[in-house]
C-alpha cells in the first residue's frame, strides 16, 4: 500500500531556521522575527547538543525531550514555556511544508495550557516581560481582543475600566491618540467621572 507522504529533503537545523526566519520577514514585523529567532534558537541548540544534524530525523519523542529540556535549562514559568512551544509548533508546521519534517510532526508538539491564575502575579510587570507578551500576542493572537487590550493597557498605562469605556470614535488614528470620555448614560464610566476625561497618546 502506497502513501502520499512527500519524500523528505535533508536539511540541517540552522539552515532550516534561517530559511524560516527569511520566510517570516515577508509577513511579520522585525520584532516578531526576533522573537521567533529567540525561540527557535533553543531547538537548534538542542539538535547540536544531541547530534541531530538533519531535521528529517526529528521524532515525537524528541519533541517531548525538547519540551522537558527547555523547562529545565531555563527554569522558566508555564507562560514562557507555552510561548516557546507554540513557536516551535509554528516552525515545524512550516518545516513540513518544505519537506524538512513529516507534515504532521507539528501536531505532536505538546503546548502546555495556561490557566488564568497562572497569568496573574502580584509583582510589577517589567518592560522585557511586557515586550515578550506583546510579541506573543502579535504572533498568535494578532488583532484579537486580548492583543488590543494588552497593547493599550501597556502603552497608555490605563485602567481596564478606562479601556472598556472607549468607543470606536474615541480612537484618532491620524492624531495617534485616544480620548477618554465619561458616559454614565451609556454604561461606560470613568473612575473619576468627568475629571478622568483626557487625551492619551498611545501609538508609536
Show where each model-derived region lies:
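N-terminal core-binding DNA-recognition domain of tyrosine recombinases/integrases
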Residues: 2, 18-120
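Short alpha-helical hairpin
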Residues: 7-20
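Short, flexible, mixed-charge acidic loops at enzyme active sites
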Residues: 10-11, 107, 123, 177-186
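Amphipathic alpha-helical recognition patches that constitute DNA-binding helices
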Residues: 32, 80-83, 148, 197-201
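Structural detector for helix-capping/boundary residues
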Residues: 61, 128, 166-169
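DNA breakage-rejoining catalytic core of tyrosine-based enzymes
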Residues: 115-132, 187-203
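Basic, Lys/Arg- and aromatic-enriched nucleic-acid-binding interface segment
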Residues: 127-160, 164, 184, 195
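Conserved tyrosine-mediated DNA breakage-rejoining catalytic core shared by Y-recombinases
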Residues: 165-204
Amino acid at each position: 500500500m502506497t502513501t502520499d507522504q512527500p519524500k523528505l529533503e535533508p536539511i540541517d537545523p540552522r539552515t532550516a531556521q534561517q530559511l524560516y526566519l527569511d520566510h517570516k520577514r515577508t509577513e511579520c514585523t522585525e520584532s516578531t522575527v526576533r522573537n521567533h529567532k529567540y525561540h527557535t534558537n533553543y531547538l537548534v541548540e538542542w539538535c547540536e547538543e544531541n547530534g541531530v544534524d538533519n531535521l528529517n530525523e526529528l521524532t515525537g519523542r524528541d519533541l517531548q525531550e525538547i519540551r522537558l529540556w527547555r523547562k529545565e535549562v531555563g527554569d522558566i514559568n508555564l507562560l514562557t514555556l507555552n510561548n516557546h512551544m507554540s513557536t516551535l509548533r509554528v516552525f515545524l508546521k512550516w518545516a513540513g511544508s518544505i519537506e524538512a519534517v513529516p507534515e504532521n510532526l507539528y501536531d505532536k508538539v505538546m503546548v502546555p495550557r495556561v490557566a488564568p491564575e497562572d497569568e496573574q502575579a502580584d509583582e510589577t510587570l517589567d518592560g522585557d516581560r511586557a515586550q515578550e507578551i506583546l510579541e506573543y500576542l502579535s504572533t498568535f493572537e494578532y488583532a484579537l481582543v486580548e492583543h488590543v487590550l494588552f497593547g493599550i493597557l501597556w502603552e497608555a498605562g490605563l485602567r481596564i475600566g478606562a479601556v472598556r469605556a472607549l468607543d470606536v470614535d474615541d480612537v484618532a488614528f491620524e492624531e495617534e491618540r485616544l480620548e477618554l470620555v465619561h458616559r454614565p448614560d451609556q454604561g461606560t464610566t470613568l473612575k473619576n467621572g468627568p475629571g478622568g476625561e483626557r487625551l492619551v497618546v498611545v501609538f508609536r
